[in-house]
Amino acid sequence: MIAEVRPGHALALRSRPFGRVLARVGSRTPFGSQRALGVVATRHGRWLAVTDAAVGNNRLVWVDAKSGALRYTRTPLELVVDLSARTLTVQRNGSTVRHLSIGVGRAGSPTPTGTFAVTDKLNGGAYSAAYGCCILSLSATQPNLPVGWTGGNRIAIHGTLSASDFGRAVSAGCVHASNSDLRYLMRTVPLGTPVVIRR
């Protein structure tokens, strides 16, 4: 399930159901996209566990489904990134739809593992030719930024200037994919789609 924050609303991200507020988020991401949260679990029919970059990796936060700030959609899709195999698999209802060869984070700035969600779909050219055609930003962050890195701490699936990146550990933590695969993902994958990154 995907929970979208309604325009004009704010949403409290809590440490647990009825717990303390860790952050408040609006209906737009820092990149200007509609905020769509991938729902990982539910509790007591009222509380939804979600991931958000505002609280860091591998930390679920809880949102009140009865707050009136959310609307819901569903997607049968899931992206599975296998860091060892250096592949990204698009799954629909558990069946493989497409298998991509990717580049991943190098030693010292590895791609973080865990369950995340697609938060933004952006034009790569608006940022740098190094990002290729397209950027799918994730709710994951990079805690091990390389010295001198100025590109922010968000993890994304994006392009590269070098086709030799695919099948290798070469990035500052992001997942590198070909422009043709990125265009497919941009067309196919809705905001809030779950992304599982594993070793």
Segments predicted by a language model, with ranges:
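Boundary regions of SH3-family modules and the immediately adjacent low-complexity/disordered segments
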Residues: 1, 51-81, 98
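Short acidic-glycine loop/turn motifs at beta-strand connectors
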Residues: 91-95
